[in-house]
Amino acid sequence: MLCCTAISITSFQRPMNITQPPQKTIVITGATGAIGGALAFEYAAPGVSLVLQGRDQQQLGALAVRCQQRGALTQCTSFDLRDTAKLRAWAAELCITTPPDLLIANAGMNINIGEEGAGERWEEMEALLDLNIKSTLALVSSIAGAMRQRGSGQIAIISSLAAYYGLPVTPSYSASKAAVKAYGEGLRGWLAADNVGVTVVMPGYVASPMCQAMPGPKPLLWTPERAARVI
């Protein structure tokens, strides 16, 4: 809810020129996930326009209401990011007037070898690689070009500590996060001259259904809210 404060101006004072602060536009993919939702809520404030993407429409709508209650404007979209043609069209739409100030490429999925260690199934591996790598590169490359042309912007790519060392229970996930880590680091050097920053975020275990589905211990488990504050 927005609050208005009345200002009394005497005849001896010059009228105050009160202008609306410019909207800061933040795009977050995977906003219905634990980290994505916590990030959206953390950034929600007056003067912020949140563009939220997620696959669960009901959860996305509830998140939008919570963010609006903190004063943010929200725009929601729900589609499968693995449809890269639709993804690139959406990214182009976002940049028609001006590209976002901040893009958080957060969407992703995880698979594992199973409780019995039977191994990952190719169908799941293919879906993971399409979402975690292909869609991330498609989105970031589409918006990075517009930011570069404008001469400003910030991109955050959510990787993982698993990018440093392949976890035996999640080999494909580890490989995908290593890929986007390398991509973000390379992109950072290319875009620096155009005043576009690139941050590669490397969270550890964060409490979520995705994390819970992984077999084995989860040391140093963080809440999504704590992770969002640090990010």
Could you describe each region identified by the protein language model?
Residues 32-33:
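Conserved glycine-rich cofactor-binding loop
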Residues 46-63:
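Conserved glycine-rich Rossmann-like NAD(P)H-binding loop of the short-chain dehydrogenase/reductase
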Residues 69-85:
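Rossmann-fold cofactor-recognition segment
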Residues 140, 176:
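Active-site helix of classical SDR
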